[in-house]
């Protein structure tokens, strides 16, 4: 009797478990995620075993056919889709293809372009996240206090994590259990997430966001160059707009850039200039340590202006749009995680110290660009280094923006909107060079008409920075790797998506209000 009762209870429990699994699987299937039950997993494993045996037989047939005389022209050639099998049904491109996934250089690189070391990749990432935008961090502390300092650390941790999971989305396990690179860019990841219903929608959204982010970064470099030169030499009869024009004239040779190798050399010089700037500013602040205003660092926040600070902090860490290209161009991609760790740790420490020390020195008088607070003699020297850093930082986002535009609009193929920018010999066509120069001039025009550094940085960070660094990587990670994620990884991804969405909306609204208010003030003056 006890055995019969135990058997019935076991059957009921099994039935309830199967029904609950079916409901959960159906719910996630409707959301677009791939959840597999135990029975489905067994089925997948069985299919993989059968497929492995089938491909082993094909390989034996191919070896036998290679050993036979070449005169047997009547033999049927093996089907390409059988040889180049890939989970998901998509065949791998033939070797030498421009779009080959494994080992591809990504959006901003290619097969025939020189590879970079982990150190060179690190200089590029450091240049992106430890760039000119550190000058706005003391302004973020002004409106955020200790919470602003916490956000500098929190943003470093989150951006390092999302950078790693974004690269993880480039890889999948093949039928033999080997991890291979099946995608080559941020756009390819987005397209894979939207397939099969909207196979190109995700790529277009990411392309637009990337172009906005990169072009706005270039604009900010021109804005800060004009601002710094104008404040360094106020006695000269040269306006800020005129200084911006001079800076743009120096940047025109960027139109001739061809690969990331040259950009990496600029990034190295730029990083060295940045360390000199940090040392000079921090040394001056330490000389006034006895006057530091610790009581001015608040535990409360300015509700209206703090969202702008969030955008500034987030934008200062944006590097995700470069990462697929950098990882694809690395000589040793296995060193990518280590490179991300030390670059973000260094950036977090330097940014936190710089922002706190600078704010303690000037407190409520802290300006949008912190070097404007320096006395005239020191300001001129520091600003010259900063201008050099801005001009050396410009090539990386400009080169990336050009590559995105060329790949999405001008690449040869049936889906290209315009003819290719390169000739058959690989040389840049004259009209392609003209378009590159036009992009440089466009950044100048925007810098002249929107010369508000901190507000523009907060707006861009809230609009595209949060999307590309927080929202999309976590969403793509859930969508593509759902079946392999542990519960804490799912929790992190969902939390990052929710927090990033809230910060993005609030920061965008308040930055836009700040720009409108700034224009009204200028109009009244």
From Swiss-Prot:
GO terms for biological process: beta-alanine transport; gamma-aminobutyric acid import; glycine transport; hippocampus development; neurotransmitter loading into synaptic vesicle. Disruption phenotype: Deficient mice exhibit embryonic lethality and a cleft palate and omphalocele. Changing residue 269 to P: In a disruption phenotype model increases presynaptic release probability leading to more severe synaptic depression during high-frequency stimulation. Chloride ions activate 4-aminobutanoate/H(+) transport. Residues 1-132, 226-265, 327-341, 405-438, 483-489 are cytoplasmic. Belongs to the amino acid/polyamine transporter 2 family. This is Vesicular inhibitory amino acid transporter.
């Amino acid at each position: 009797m006890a055995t019969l009762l135990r058997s019935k209870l076991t059957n009921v429990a099994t039935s309830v478990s199967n029904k609950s699994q079916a409901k959960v699987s159906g719910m996630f299937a409707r959301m677009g995620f791939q959840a597999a039950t135990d029975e489905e997993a067994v089925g997948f494993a069985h299919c993989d075993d059968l497929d492995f045996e089938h491909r082993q037989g094909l390989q034996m047939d191919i070896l036998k056919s290679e050993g036979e005389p070449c005169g047997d022209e009547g033999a049927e050639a093996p089907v390409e889709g059988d040889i180049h099998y890939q989970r998901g049904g998509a065949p791998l491109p033939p070797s030498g293809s421009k779009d080959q996934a494994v080992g591809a250089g990504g959006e901003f690189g290619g097969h025939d372009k020189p590879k970079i070391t982990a150190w060179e990749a690190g200089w590029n990432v450091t240049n992106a996240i430890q760039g000119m935008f550190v000058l706005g961090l003391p302004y973020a502390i002004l409106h955020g206090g200790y919470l602003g300092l916490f956000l500098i650390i929190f943003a470093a941790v989150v951006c390092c994590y999302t950078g790693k999971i974004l690269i993880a989305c480039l890889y999948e396990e093949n039928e033999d259990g080997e991890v291979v690179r099946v995608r080559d860019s941020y756009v390819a990841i987005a397209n894979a997430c939207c397939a099969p219903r909207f196979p190109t929608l995700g790529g277009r959204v990411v392309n637009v966001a990337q172009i906005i982010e990169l072009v706005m970064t270039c604009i900010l470099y021109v804005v800060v160059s004009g601002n710094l030169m104008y404040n360094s030499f106020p006695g000269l009869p040269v306006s800020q707009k005129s200084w911006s024009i001079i800076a743009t004239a120096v940047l025109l040779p960027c139109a001739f850039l061809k690969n990331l190798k040259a950009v990496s050399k600029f990034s190295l010089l730029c990083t060295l200039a940045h360390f000199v700037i940090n040392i000079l500013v921090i040394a001056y602040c330490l000389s006034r340590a006895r006057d530091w205003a610790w009581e001015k660092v608040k535990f409360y926040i300015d509700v209206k202006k703090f969202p702008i600070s969030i955008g500034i902090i987030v934008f200062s860490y944006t590097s995700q749009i470069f990462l697929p290209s950098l990882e694809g161009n690395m000589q040793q991609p296995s060193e990518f995680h280590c490179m991300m760790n030390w670059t973000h740790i260094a950036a977090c420490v330097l940014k936190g110290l710089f922002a706190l020390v600078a704010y303690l020195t000037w407190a409520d008088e802290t300006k949008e660009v912190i070097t404007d607070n320096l006395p005239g003699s020191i300001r001129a020297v520091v600003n010259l280094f900063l201008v050099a850093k801005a001009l050396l930082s410009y090539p990386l986002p400009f080169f990336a923006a050009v590559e995105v535009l060329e790949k999405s609009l001008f690449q040869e193929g049936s889906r290209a909107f315009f003819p290719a920018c390169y000739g058959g010999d690989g040389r840049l066509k004259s009209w392609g060079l003209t378009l590159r120069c036009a992009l440089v001039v466009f950044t100048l025009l925007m810098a002249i008409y929107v010369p508000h550094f901190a507000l523009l940085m907060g707006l861009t960070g809230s609009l595209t920075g949060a999307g590309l660094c927080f929202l999309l990587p976590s969403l793509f990670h859930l969508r593509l790797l759902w079946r392999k994620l542990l519960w804490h990884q799912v929790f992190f991804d969902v939390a990052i998506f929710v927090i990033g969405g809230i910060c993005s909306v609030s920061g965008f609204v308040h930055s836009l209000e700040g720009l409108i208010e700034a224009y009204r003030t200028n109009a009244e003056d």
